[in-house]
A protein has these predicted regions:
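Generic alpha-helical transmembrane segments of integral inner-membrane proteins
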Residues: 26, 30, 34, 38, ...
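Small-residue-rich hydrophobic transmembrane alpha-helices
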Residues: 51-114, 155-174, 286-352, 383-405
Length: 461
């Protein structure tokens, strides 16, 4: 028992450092997801077709968001280690890489959405009821996408800045910027969706406009703070005096980061493909999944952000050459993450059924959403472990391994299971959803042996 405690349980100082880093990130994402939840409810009050149209577009934006995240994460592997080593110039080059990569991804995404947005939305619409509801949902989806695209550029810029700021251990400022953005989004949503006083009722278009405006607010706050506090953001020294970076630096980040960039993109595409497989069961399934996903995201933030903190803490230890400290911290953080998420899973099981009742939709959709939430709660502790394993492997630059562990697993195991069960069996959609989610157990076993092998204990800078 003493050995177990020594290996997997830290002291007060350890948890204080971990939580000081994690809590602002958890709060930031909690507020963001809470506002997304409120936004979802407000759009849901307009009708099932409006809610479904917006939900489908948000699936497409999800792929874009993860592609940007992958682009900046490629350089973040080096950024955390550069900062840990005190190499501010290297940190600056990693920032440039992030900015260029995020803007390139944005340009590609906007081109695809402009030229084939209708086709992408249509992939998720199957008219099983024969009442024309899918055509209405398509029209609302197109309206939402055309406006929300305007907010992609500020999102890309924010990610480049915010990730570099977090690598220096300053998680408070991105949190404040996020508060301002989501707060304004909530207020603007209410005013523009329903129309208050002289402001006209804009419905779905109002939700899109509110999202775009909040993106710009967040970007302005993050960028202005970073440039006004150069002493805390040394990577900005000379960041805009030139546009290039040493070929050696670029090559190293690109080669190490390419699997990670592809991983985020392919994983997100895989998840949306799974949703598309579910969508053949009808519009009610898409609506139920939308509600369940919105609620689940509120609870998932704990393991997502605790996992992200692993990459920062372990990355800094690795950059400083303290490999044993990195291994020790990793063991303790993984156990802590799984414990916290087990508690969250119990809470989610107990209260999850209340949330779908808030929506203005059919009893069938509410029932489906409640079942999907229960399944997600059961699987959550396993997701916490695999997520922690992913960030452990990533912190040591094992991007090819993370590529195989994450996106290849999704496309080789998860997508085929969802495709076959949804299209070629008579199983109910809840049973299909449970079996697809249960594939996470296979990933737990793989993650355990990968982390235990210590293949990630590498100093790269």
């Amino acid at each position: 028992m003493h050995k177990f405690r020594q290996k997997y349980i830290g002291d007060k100082a350890f948890y204080k450092r971990y939580l000081m880093l994690a809590i602002p990130m958890i709060i930031q994402n909690a507020i963001t997801n809470l506002v997304s939840f409120l936004d979802n409810i407000m759009v849901g009050q307009l009708g099932t077709e409006q809610m479904s149209g917006v939900a489908i577009v948000n699936q497409l934006i999800f792929v874009y968001n993860l592609a940007v995240f992958g682009a900046v994460s490629a350089a973040s592997i080096f950024g955390a280690q550069y900062f840990g080593k005190g190499n501010h110039k290297g940190h600056m080059y990693s920032f440039r890489f992030k900015l260029y990569a995020a803007l390139l991804v944005t340009a590609i995404a906007m081109t695809l959405f402009i030229t084939n947005g209708t086709g992408f939305i249509s992939l998720y619409l199957t008219d099983t009821a024969g009442n024309g509801a899918t055509e209405v949902a398509l029209a609302y989806g197109k309206e939402y996408l055309e406006i929300v695209m305007i907010g992609l550029i500020p999102f890309a810029v924010t990610q480049a800045y915010a990730t570099n700021i977090k690598e220096t251990g300053q998680t408070f400022v991105p949190m404040v910027a996020s508060f301002a953005a989501v707060g304004s989004n909530a207020v603007l949503d209410f005013l523009l969706i329903f129309g208050i006083g002289p402001i006209p009722k804009l419905g779905v278009a109002g939700a899109a406009i509110a999202t775009v405006m909040s993106r710009y607010i967040e970007t302005i706050i993050v960028v202005l703070w970073a440039h006004k506090n150069r002493d805390k953001n040394r990577y900005l020294e000379g960041a805009y005096r030139g546009i290039g970076m040493p070929f050696g630096e670029f090559k190293t980040i690109f080669i190490k980061g390419l699997p990670l960039m592809l991983n985020e993109l392919l994983w997100a595409a895989g998840m949306t493909t799974v949703t598309q497989c579910y969508s053949v069961r009808g519009l009610s399934v898409i609506a139920g999944l939308n509600i369940a996903t919105t609620i689940t995201n509120l609870f998932n933030i704990v393991f997502i952000q605790l996992g992200a903190c692993i990459s920062i803490v372990v990355g800094q230890y690795l950059g400083a050459g303290e490999l044993e400290k990195a291994k020790d911290a990793d063991n303790k953080m993984i156990v802590f993450s799984v414990f916290c998420c087990s508690v969250m899973a119990v809470v989610m099981l107990l209260v999850g059924g209340f949330f779908p009742q808030i929506y203005n939709t059919t009893d069938e959709i509410k029932s489906l959403a409640t079942s999907f939430i229960a399944v997600s709660a059961i699987i959550m502790p396993f997701c916490a472990f695999t997520h922690s394993s992913y960030f452990t492997l990533r912190s040591g630059g094992k991007t090819l391994v993370t590529f195989l562990f994450d996106s290849v697993f999704t496309w080789v195991i998860v997508v085929p299971v969802a495709f076959v069960l949804a299209k070629y069996t008579a199983l109910g959609i809840v049973a299909v959803y449970f079996l697809v989610q249960a594939t996470e157990l296979i990933k737990v076993v793989i993650g355990y042996f990968m982390v235990k092998s210590d293949v990630w204990l590498v100093q790269m800078v």
